[in-house]
Curated annotation (Swiss-Prot):
One of its GO terms (cellular component) is cytosolic large ribosomal subunit. GO terms for biological process: translation. This is Large ribosomal subunit protein bL19. Keywords: Ribonucleoprotein, Ribosomal protein. It comes from Prosthecochloris aestuarii (strain DSM 271 / SK 413). The keyword Isomerase does not apply. It comes from the Bacteria. The keyword Ubl conjugation does not apply. GO terms for molecular function: structural constituent of ribosome. InterPro entries: Ribosomal_bL19 (IPR001857), Ribosomal_bL19_CS (IPR018257), Ribosomal_bL19_sf (IPR038657), Translation_prot_SH3-like_sf (IPR008991). This protein is located at the 30S-50S ribosomal subunit interface and may play a role in the structure and function of the aminoacyl-tRNA binding site. Gene3D superfamilies: 2.30.30.790. Belongs to the bacterial ribosomal protein bL19 family.
């Protein structure tokens, strides 16, 4: 039974998303439905948490909007995610970056940058 669940989840998991980790700064396009209309909304911030696995994987993205910290928990397998683009790759020593919540201003989003080699063939 457990193997059957794994097979079904693997078939339903999204494959078009980039590899992301806590500390990365991402820009995502989210599909928002307002009444009859549908539009794309950009959301850019730092990943401060990553939890779950497979189809249940979620990330917490934090941004500063008008001086106020805004966090959003987003299921990565959601059909409302149009695209995710990694702006900066962050280098951290923690899996959960909850200490960023105490910071203000530019320091609230400052994470050391890690070097990433370009994918082969590009």
């Amino acid at each position: 039974m457990d193997q059957l669940i794994q097979v079904v989840e693997a078939a339903q998991e999204r494959q078009d998303l980039p590899e992301i980790r806590p500390g990365d700064t991402i820009k995502m396009q989210l599909r928002v439905i307002e009444g009859e209309k549908e539009r794309l909304q950009a959301y850019e911030g730092v990943i401060i948490s990553d939890s779950g696995a497979g189809t249940n994987r979620t990330i917490t993205v934090r941004k500063i909007s008008n001086g106020v910290g805004v966090e959003r928990i987003i299921p990565l397998n959601s059909p409302n995610i149009e695209s995710i683009e990694v702006r900066k790759y962050g280098k951290t020593r923690r899996a959960k970056l909850s200490y960023l919540r105490k910071r203000t201003g530019k320091a609230a989003l400052r994470v050391k940058e890690r070097k990433v080699s370009a994918p082969a063939g590009k």
